[in-house]
Amino acid sequence: MKRLNLHAGLVSASLIFFLLLAGCKSTPAGRPVDPLELIDAESSFYIAVPKNADNVLIERIITGFYEQASESDAKMIAERVNKVYCGLNRSKRSMEVQASIDGNIPRKYLPKLLNGKNGWVTSDYTPEGSLENYKIYSGQIEMTFPSENIACIGRNLEGMLDKFDALSKLPADDSTELYTDLDSETANYLKGAESEIRFFAKNPQSFLTILTGAQLDLKLIDVKGNFETDPKHQNQYLLDLDFLFKNGTFLKAGKTLLTLAFGLTNSQEEIIGDTELIIRDIRIDKQQLYKLLSI
């Protein structure tokens, strides 16, 4: 496992997207594997970024972590990406990333990019009990391409390949929607991201600090929510947040702090039961999300 610094972090992103098809073998006959199924439960923050929600964000991921990518290259690559799933663990000096990417990229870029001259080291990996052999490419970031439409990057690639190999051998008519290490509610929530960016935070403190600019001790269990581009202000998102507090007392105190931090009105808030607070239509600058992702 490699721990990535912030800008080697998510990627040599343009390489990842260029090579989404380039490094792959044919998908074995059997059940199609969903990219989300390869994300494990060891991250503290999860985000699903569909192309339809904010193509510019995907371009920013590319150019922010692979400086050699031109603006035109980033646009071309982003057009071939359908959705990015990421699990993140942040510290003061680094970000640990696990990503599974759904896309469609031509094979012709492989010989030009994944070679020793460009600083890449190739190794082979065969899951226990399998006859399949997978290539792992190590450079600024580790990556692998288990199928024609999936790229995996970052943490625990061998575990992701183990999962892919096992799932791809299931019968093609297997009706199970998702085999996931995440709890079903979180997985289905992320899977449903089509026209909006969705996230789930098991450790939401740093997330809230970036959004509000304040250190808020809210005694939370978790936070989930979504970002959509504000149709009236293309440089802003409308953000919905769903807070789960440890108890009702913490909810009341947290509601007061959040009202002040976001400048909320009563019409934007809804309390469900004793511990859940939903806040809708918070207007934030897109740069705040880019900062959260360090791009």
Segments (PLM) and residue ranges:
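Bacterial N-terminal signal peptides that target proteins for export
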Residues: 2-13
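C-terminal motif of bacterial Sec signal peptides marking the signal peptidase cleavage site
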Residues: 21-23
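Bacterial signal peptide processing site
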Residues: 25-28
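An internal, short helix-loop-strand segment that often contains or flanks glycine-aspartate motifs
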Residues: 34-36, 42-84, 122-237
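Short cationic amphipathic helices and targeting signals
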Residues: 47, 94-103, 149-154, 237-246, ...
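Long, charged/polar, surface-exposed segments that mediate recognition or autoinhibition
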Residues: 92-121, 166-173
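Short secondary-structure junctions
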Residues: 117-129, 264-271
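Leucine-rich, highly hydrophobic segment in Treponema pallidum outer-membrane-associated proteins
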Residues: 190-295
